[in-house]
UniProtKB/Swiss-Prot annotation:
Protein name, as recorded: Energy-coupling factor transporter ATP-binding protein EcfA2
This protein's UniProt keywords: ATP-binding, Cell membrane, Membrane, Nucleotide-binding, Translocase, Transport
Domain (ABC transporter): residue spans on this chain: 3-261
Subunit: Forms a stable energy-coupling factor (ECF) transporter complex composed of 2 membrane-embedded substrate-binding proteins (S component), 2 ATP-binding proteins (A component) and 2 transmembrane proteins (T component).
Entries under InterPro entries matching the protein: AAA+_ATPase (IPR003593), ABC_transporter-like_ATP-bd (IPR003439), ABC_transporter-like_CS (IPR017871), ABC_transpr_CbiO/EcfA_su (IPR015856), ECF_ABC_transporter_ATP-bd (IPR050095), EcfA2 (IPR030946), P-loop_NTPase (IPR027417)
NCBIfam families recorded: ECF_ATPase_2, PRK13651.1
Organism expressing this protein natively: Mycoplasmopsis pulmonis (strain UAB CTIP)
UniProt family annotation: Belongs to the ABC transporter superfamily. Energy-coupling factor EcfA family.
Role: ATP-binding (A) component of a common energy-coupling factor (ECF) ABC-transporter complex. Unlike classic ABC transporters this ECF transporter provides the energy necessary to transport a number of different substrates.
Locations listed in the record: Cell membrane
CDD domains given in the database record: ABC_cobalt_CbiO_domain1 (cd03225)
Name of the coding gene: ecfA2
Amino acid sequence: MQIIVKNISYIYNRKTALALKALDDSSCIINQGEHVAIIGSTGSGKTTFIEHLNALLIPETGTINWIFENEHKKTKEKYLEDVVLKRTYFKKVKKAKDIRRRIGVVFQFAEYQIFEETIEKDIMFGPRSYGVSKEEAKQRAAKYLEMVGLPLEFLEKNPFGLSGGQKRRVALAGILAIEPDFLVLDEPTAGLDPQGVKDILDIFDNINKNGKTVIMVTHDLDNVLERTKRTLVFDKGKLIRDAGTYEILKDEKFLVENKLKSPKLITFVNKLEQRGIFLKPVTSIDKLAIELNIYLRNKQQSNE
């Protein structure tokens, strides 16, 4: 699957004194299998952007092309959903249900997406809404509950008695059970303890390794550095930079100019470089330790 975003803009409270341009002429292409971060200061347009990816919002101007295989056709022909986004005649997006099945969104307060009386029913709701049989939906509920790190005995529990972190996992399992091609996450680690953060990010890594696209909106640039390969940076509604994650996060001047705090690891690496110690690109503490050991070993050998 592929999403092609071309010059989209969006205005909240259009034609009122409170009108706010939340997106301004933004374009990008997101491909199947990518692991992408979306960063920017508060109010930069990140959440508004992701709400366009599965047609929850329709831009004032611009187009979004969703390209995916149409399994209802007998041939291998691909189905191209090309929406010319003009509010004057688009009351709703054609094929919106198809789009939303393929692009699952987990919002910041995912626990508010829970509403059924048991966890099993809650996870089953999405697949059943898209025509999956009851038996298959039950199998998916068990499969994805375990995938998010919760035991099968939770299936019969009432989700409202769970902790905040557990509710978030249940909400994630419900989206995964739809089996989307793209998984879009808005601040997925907010409010979690360090172990919970690691666990949930490991889940996203495994999903990505299985060929799914993972798009993560977050303020935690340390996690962005370690987990993602590509980063989109928003400021005042504009997509101002789209490049490799390491390239962007290594540019401390750029981050400061855009009110973003450099990852602690990058700050340390930059200080090493100021002292004449240059290492290969590192994205985690473990990789930093390896590169430092190599540097010290080489330095020792050169002094012998």
